[in-house]
Amino acid sequence: RAQRSGQRARALIQQMLTFSRGQRGEPRPLQLAPLIKETVKLLGATLPSSIEFATRLENDAPQAQLDPVQVEQVLMNLCINARDAMQGNGRIEVRLAATAHESQICASCRQAVAGHFVEICVSDSGPGIPPEVLERMFEPFFSTKEVGKGSGMGLATVHGIVHEHGGHVLVDS
């Protein structure tokens, strides 16, 4: 298990380096439910017992052409932000579903979002995101965390990976 975790860490670092150079990693057809289950299992082990971690996954959601390590990175970043927003207790839920959007706006690139998508949703029971933070949360190095507690790169990385794969980020707070 330790060796596998070490290999995963190495792969994540490699993907972050690849992403920083503006490359797409290695997209391939993926069934997302098994990947999400595995990632959630790893994340769940890092959460305090005062945080409930749940999933609702459509096992028959369509495949998507994605890099699995980058999907894992996005999930980890979103769940870590959710954990931190709840300040020690609450609920995080990860959902996977085929969905359609008609007139949404991407929170990170501000483009209109319409069409059919495979959607990964991370929600939490935290207090919500203040409007002034919503405006800047995807900017590189922007952070609401105290110095030394966050790099401000988590959501910027989410933005980059999601958009490199042709997706968008919707925020409801």
Model-assigned labels for residue ranges:
Residues 1-173:
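Core catalytic ATP-binding domain of two-component histidine kinases
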